[in-house]
Amino acid sequence: MDIGAIKGVDPEVFEIIMQEALRQQEGLELIASENTTSRAVMAAQGSVLTNKYAEGYPSKRYYGGCAMVDRAETLAIDRARELFKAEYANVQPHSGSTANMAAYFSVIKPGDTVLAMDLSHGGHLTHGSPVSFSGRLFNFVHYGLSGETEMIDMDEVAALAEKHRPKLIVAGASAYPRIIDFKAFSDIARSVNALFMVDMAHIAGLVAAGVHPSPVPHADIVTTTTHKTLRGPRGGLILSSNEIGPKISSQIFPGIQGGPLMHVIAAKAVALKEALSPSFAQYQRQVVANAATLADALMDRGMKLVSNGTDNHLMLLNLTHNGISGKDAENRLGAAGITVNKNAVPNDPRGPMITSGIRIGTPLVTTRGMGETEMDLVAELITQALEAPATAETVREKVRSLCAQFPLYKDDTTRG
């Protein structure tokens, strides 16, 4: 997208954008929650729709002149419902956290008990962390991973549900590399007369393509972001039934948000159309294949992975026995042009700003066009950067060479 208009008005911001574009182009982005949107998605976000205020919902706005943005939002809603086979969709949440807040407020009250995954075992801040609104407003009880398999302990989930009788059970994670059994969660929720919610922010693209089981047939509410594996703009989305839907709508507006971001909603519509295409399904299959290959290649080089592998787009490296922290690993890899994030591992003795692990994902490198052959090389580069930090510049040159073969945008009009 041509951003040359910025240069004459604000050269400092223009230079920041140019430097970030160069960083993304020349580096290996392996943060599991990051991806690269299409030019069409970016163009929608930079369109004249950013000028329009549109409080309310299609055909029920508090402002005039909303005919075109009504059409854009309706397209996004219809495409979300079609893609995920849901009765109801709300495309207005500004983020996944906002979507979760609205979902909670729709079906539970402050002080109610909720059962969700522990953050230190792979959950999310909005699943009851004490530093989040969720942990402050609701009584969260947490389940975790089996010490033996490092997978979700469904026996523990059932026992905690029976003991605490929560009003809501939440499944979904920010750092869990295995398939989640949504039906088993749903059965447990029904057994204690609880509602069931799924936060599928990380796996929405996989679900859309059918490479991960869908939570929609089993959950009362499903929330997600629209970026990550879905490869759209940064934002949120809520799916539910026609029965619960009106409660969600009123919590989003006027309960939590005011004016929706119509330029972002239009970009969501574009991304959802892309996600309905056969090429998107093939992309998601490659994401999973790349993750499996990368995981195996890392383990072949002596790395320890939580649960000994992956079923989805991400993996967790446990560095407890490597003599380095997650923070050190993030810095070593960063010096070599490889971007990851430090991440807690089960029973991590280190704090959240240090950690004993790193999280790695394949969505963005797959968007670049890389396949299984490249994943073996990526594993070698990761291993070298971690074990021989003095060779960082050598690794960085190899990273640049690899990335040059798989450019993010083949024409460089981002440079204005």
Swiss-Prot record:
Cofactor(s) needed: pyridoxal 5'-phosphate
Q: From the UniProt record, give the pathway where this protein acts.
A: One-carbon metabolism; tetrahydrofolate interconversion; Amino-acid biosynthesis; glycine biosynthesis; glycine from L-serine: step 1/1
Query: Where is this protein found?
Result: Cytoplasm
**Where in the chain is the site Plays an important role in substrate specificity?**
227
Alphabetic keyword roster: Amino-acid biosynthesis, Cytoplasm, One-carbon metabolism, Pyridoxal phosphate, Transferase
Please give the catalytic activity noted in the UniProt record.
(6R)-5,10-methylene-5,6,7,8-tetrahydrofolate + glycine + H2O = (6S)-5,6,7,8-tetrahydrofolate + L-serine
Q: Does the keyword Cytoplasm apply?
A: yes
| Entry annotated with the keyword Amino-acid biosynthesis | yes
Q: What is its main location?
A: cytoplasm
| A GO molecular-function descriptor | pyridoxal phosphate binding
Q: What is its EC number?
A: 2.1.2.1
Q: InterPro entries from the xrefs?
A: PyrdxlP-dep_Trfase (IPR015424), PyrdxlP-dep_Trfase_major (IPR015421), PyrdxlP-dep_Trfase_small (IPR015422), Ser_HO-MeTrfase (IPR001085), Ser_HO-MeTrfase-like (IPR049943), Ser_HO-MeTrfase_PLP_BS (IPR019798), SHMT-like_dom (IPR039429)
Q: Which residues carry this modification: N6-(pyridoxal phosphate)lysine?
A: 228
The residues the record assigns to binding (6S)-5,6,7,8-tetrahydrofolate are: 119, 123-125, 243
| One GO cellular component, as annotated | cytosol
Q: Name one GO biological process term.
A: glycine biosynthetic process from serine
Q: What class of enzyme is it?
A: transferase
Subunit-structure text: Homodimer.
What is the recorded name of this protein? Answer: Serine hydroxymethyltransferase
- State the species of origin: Desulforapulum autotrophicum (strain ATCC 43914 / DSM 3382 / VKM B-1955 / HRM2)
